[in-house]
């Protein structure tokens, strides 16, 4: 939630709910005709972000944006049209949308320190909090992630984006109770409107709870809905590895058909980890 959304809390409730739960179909169905100017601006940015997440074309993303703002420029830059660094330089000190989307851009490019610096400029911005939690967890700083979330709860209600951040803290922290808590959050969000994001969250918790068969079922459904959804593919790789020879051939075939695509960042990540493993193996064998 961007900082000046506080005054638009009721107007944007379902917009945020649908976006952060990955229920993009419901998001696109929202009637924007009676929205305030600022409410419309934020809703269009959420919708454009949803289109970007679904892999839609730049033209499709542009078509949803009727207002020219620093935020709309930032989402277009995130989609590959524009200079994000310039937008950050011009608006990063004051615009919450630019701070959030600029940080996402920097995270995608591996500039985690720059992203954290930008996020810390944001005032009462729930998504900025969630992104800081993500960076802390990526750096294995669980206590820092917990403290960041705790501080946010001093001034914010337990909005959906904070519930999701809490769930990922629980998954990284470990323990059966924490895994179950995370699973139930994703299961509740999945509800009657199943979507790839919540299905993948459930699957991740299932993997941690040593339930790879259940995880594969959720992941197959996620990929049926959104092919090339890399988070689902990553977790499917883990679930298949956990099952070993018992992994169903159908799941192996699904994974193989996607990972043969050279465009997937997942392949780059897997190749990077394979090279690291080979390096460590060589070092170990040389000292054994």
UniProtKB/Swiss-Prot annotation:
Primary localization: cytoplasm
Keywords annotated in UniProt: Cytoplasm, Cytoplasmic vesicle, ER-Golgi transport, Golgi apparatus, Membrane, Phosphoprotein, Protein transport, Transport
Source organism superkingdom: Eukaryota
Gene Ontology biological process terms in this record: endoplasmic reticulum to Golgi vesicle-mediated transport; intra-Golgi vesicle-mediated transport; intracellular protein transport; late endosome to vacuole transport via multivesicular body sorting pathway; retrograde vesicle-mediated transport, Golgi to endoplasmic reticulum
Cystine pairings recorded for this chain: none
Cellular component annotations (GO), alphabetically ordered: COPI vesicle coat; cytoplasm; cytosol; Golgi membrane
InterPro entries: Coatomer_esu, TPR-like_helical_dom_sf
Membrane topology, as annotated: Peripheral membrane protein
Molecular function terms from GO: structural molecule activity
Locations listed in the record: Cytoplasm; Golgi apparatus membrane; Cytoplasmic vesicle, COPI-coated vesicle membrane
Modified residues (Phosphoserine): 262
Family: Belongs to the COPE family.
Subunit structure: Oligomeric complex that consists of at least the alpha, beta, beta', gamma, delta, epsilon and zeta subunits.
Primary role: The coatomer is a cytosolic protein complex that binds to dilysine motifs and reversibly associates with Golgi non-clathrin-coated vesicles, which further mediate biosynthetic protein transport from the ER, via the Golgi up to the trans Golgi network. The coatomer complex is required for budding from Golgi membranes, and is essential for the retrograde Golgi-to-ER transport of dilysine-tagged proteins.
The protein's name: Probable coatomer subunit epsilon
Species the sequence originates in: Schizosaccharomyces pombe (strain 972 / ATCC 24843)
Gene (UniProt): sec28
């Amino acid at each position: 939630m961007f900082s000046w959304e506080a005054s638009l809390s009721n107007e944007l409730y379902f917009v945020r709910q649908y976006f952060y739960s990955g229920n993009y179909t419901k998001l696109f169905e929202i009637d924007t005709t009676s929205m305030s100017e600022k409410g419309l601006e934020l809703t269009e940015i959420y919708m454009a972000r949803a289109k970007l997440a679904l892999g839609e074309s730049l033209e499709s993303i542009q078509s949803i944006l009727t207002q020219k703002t620093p935020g709309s420029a930032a989402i277009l830059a995130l989609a590959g049209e524009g200079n994000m660094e310039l937008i950050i330089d011009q608006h990063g000190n004051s615009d919450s949308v630019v701070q959030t989307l600029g940080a996402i851009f920097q995270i995608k490019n591996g500039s985690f320190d720059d992203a954290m610096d930008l996020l810390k400029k944001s005032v009462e911005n729930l998504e900025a909090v969630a992104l800081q939690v993500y960076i802390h967890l990526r750096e294995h700083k669980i206590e820092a992630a917990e403290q960041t979330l705790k501080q946010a709860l001093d001034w914010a209600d337990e909005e959906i984006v904070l519930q999701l951040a809490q769930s990922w803290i629980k998954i990284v922290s470990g323990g059966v109770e924490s895994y179950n808590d995370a699973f139930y959050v994703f299961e509740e969000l999945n509800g009657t409107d199943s979507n790839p994001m919540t299905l993948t969250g459930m699957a991740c918790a299932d993997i941690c709870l040593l339930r790879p068969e259940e995880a594969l079922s959720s992941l197959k459904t996620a990929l049926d809905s959104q092919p090339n959804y890399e988070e689902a593919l990553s977790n499917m790789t883990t679930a298949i590895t956990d099952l070993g020879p018992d992994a169903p051939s159908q799941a192996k075939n699904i994974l193989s058909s996607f990972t043969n695509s050279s465009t997937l960042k997942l392949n780059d990540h897997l190749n990077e980890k394979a090279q690291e493993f080979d390096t460590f193996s060589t070092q170990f064998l040389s000292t054994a």
